[in-house]
Every structure is written in C-alpha cells, then in structure tokens.
C-alpha cells in the first residue's frame, strides 16, 4: 500500500456515520480508520512542511506560483508514492457495507470505491 491510497481512503471515510453495523464490523472499521488517520495526519503536516521548504526565498504575495507548484507537486507526489505497511482494509461483510452506504446516502462512485476497498 502506498501513502496516497491510505490518504484517499481516509478522506472518504472520515465523515461517514457508522450506522447499525455489527459489533465486529464497527470495531474493525474504527481500528482501520485510526490507522488510516495516522497517515492522513502525517500528510497534512508534510504538505505544510514541503510548502515551506519549496517556497522561493524571494517570493512575494502576487508572484507567479507556477514554478513553486511544480516543485511542490513533485515533492508531495514522491512522499505520497512511498510504500507503507499494508493496512488491512478488507474488513466489512456485505451487510455492514450496505448499512454504511444506506446510513450515508453515498453516491455511486463512493459505493464502488468502498466495495472495492472494504469488503472481506
């Protein structure tokens, strides 16, 4: 698993309501979210750090940011593509995933992504 995958999945999951999942499902879901959150929080911090590190020394408000953006994107993408210890995301039964989808009225692409990532 790369960091980008963990960040993207947490970004989808962080606002979802759990609904009436089974005890096993809710426990696994919460523990997985906590592991993903560690990577997401690291991402939030590293974005700021990389932005500061790549900011041109003579930059003034209103200056063209194209070069800065290019350098920043290269650095953040390098970080996002780093491998991490795999986080088991295939933790939910069909019933628990359906409960999660119903409780949150999720659109089709989110349902597809969650099915791909969360079903045992």
Place the predicted regions along the sequence by residue:
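A composition-driven surface/loop motif
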Residues: 1-120
């Amino acid at each position: 698993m790369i960091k980008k995958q963990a960040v993207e999945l947490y970004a989808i999951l962080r606002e979802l309501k759990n609904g009436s999942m089974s005890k096993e499902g809710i426990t696994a879901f919460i523990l997985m979210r906590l592991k993903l959150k560690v990577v997401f929080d690291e991402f939030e911090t590293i974005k700021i750090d990389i932005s500061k590190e790549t900011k041109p020394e003579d930059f003034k408000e209103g200056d063209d940011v194209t070069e800065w953006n290019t350098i920043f994107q290269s650095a953040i993408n390098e970080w996002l593509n780093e491998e991490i210890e795999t986080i088991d995301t295939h933790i939910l039964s069909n019933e628990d995933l359906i409960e999660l989808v119903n409780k949150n009225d999720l659109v089709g692409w989110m349902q597809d992504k969650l099915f791909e990532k969360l079903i045992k």
